[in-house]
Amino acid sequence: MKFSLESNHKHARAGRLSVNNKTINTPAFMTIGTYGSVKTMDTFDLKKCNVEIILSNAFHLMLRPGTALIEKFGGLHQLMNWDGLILTDSGGYQVFSLGKDIKISDVGAEFRSPFNGDKVLMTPEISIDVQTKINTDIMMIFDECIKYPSNLSVTEKSMELSLRWAERSKKANYASKTLFGIVQGGMLSLIHI
């Protein structure tokens, strides 16, 4: 990964981010392709719109169409017929958005699949393994997402758990892919990390 600052003015900046010999201009708008496709658009349309990066979701892709199927295609790029950058979110927010029946522990998050009701365990290691197997360019650590507003005690406890999960995500990165962290500390800037 390489980042170069191209220009800056006061609090603004423009740069270029290169990962896996693919480069995007920053700041960048990430087009959403949660399940590995952008609704109503094919890759030709995306290129016409100068899309440089697509955001997909490891949680959803793991559950449907499934990691094994994406691997059979040779990865998410081949499945999507996309040669630009792909960033996959780890699934922390999606677990949170399921609402009830979620068990969060040091191990990970246990929940029921929104598609078929099966019991699913998502851990930092599983999230990184999925993101590696689908061959994304930029992986996000698995973190806990908490409701807003949350008090200092809840926010600190979640931040500490997410930091432990971040360490495990980093250790699980066996393919040494580009791995990004997520700002922790909720809306309480005094504990942002």
Regions found by a protein language model. Name each.
Residues I191-I193:
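Conserved small/polar residues in nucleotide/adenosyl-binding loops
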Residues M139-I141, Y174-L188:
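Intrinsically disordered, low-complexity segments enriched in small residues
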Residues M1-Y174:
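Non-catalytic, usually N-terminal nucleic-acid engagement modules in DNA/RNA processing proteins
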